[in-house]
A protein has these predicted regions:
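Ser/Thr-rich, low-complexity intrinsically disordered terminal regions
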Residues: 18-127
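C-terminal motif of bacterial Sec signal peptides marking the signal peptidase cleavage site
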Residues: 13-16
Length: 127
């Protein structure tokens, strides 16, 4: 019985906690500590979200921006000045919605992920 309890506790630690927040623009954003990934659905087509993402990364002066995106899904990578890798995965959900996942570094960085997301969201809502 003790082994089962210890195993369940370990699984809980590995999976990590999930936190959710609603941005001022009304988007529900979740972040899983175990994965280090910020997830959300944005109102916008794949091309709109892709353009907003690339513009955001350029404005934040990230380097080595690489984009492999079509109208259904894609991946955008870049590096921060200190060498930390930023990975953004996009996937079209319906005709006017796009799923976005942002991971900063190996373990994830919630604060920087949220800052990138908010900039992307503002660009889309501004259009």
């Amino acid at each position: 019985m003790k082994k089962i309890i210890v195993a369940l506790m370990c699984v809980g630690v590995l999976v990590g906690c999930k936190s959710s927040v609603v941005t001022p623009e009304g988007t529900d954003v979740s972040y899983r500590k175990g994965e280090g990934v910020l997830r959300a659905n944005l109102e916008g087509t794949m091309p709109e979200v892709t353009s907003a993402t690339l513009a955001t990364l350029e404005d934040l002066e990230l380097v080595g921006i690489d984009s492999t995106v079509d109208k259904l899904q894609g991946k955008i990578t870049a590096r921060m000045a200190v060498g930390t890798k930023v990975t953004i995965n996009l996937k079209g959900v319906g005709t006017d919605s796009t799923s976005i996942k942002i991971k900063v570094g190996t373990l994830g960085d919630r604060s920087i992920s949220m800052q990138i997301f908010r900039n992307i969201e503002k660009r889309i809502k501004g259009n």
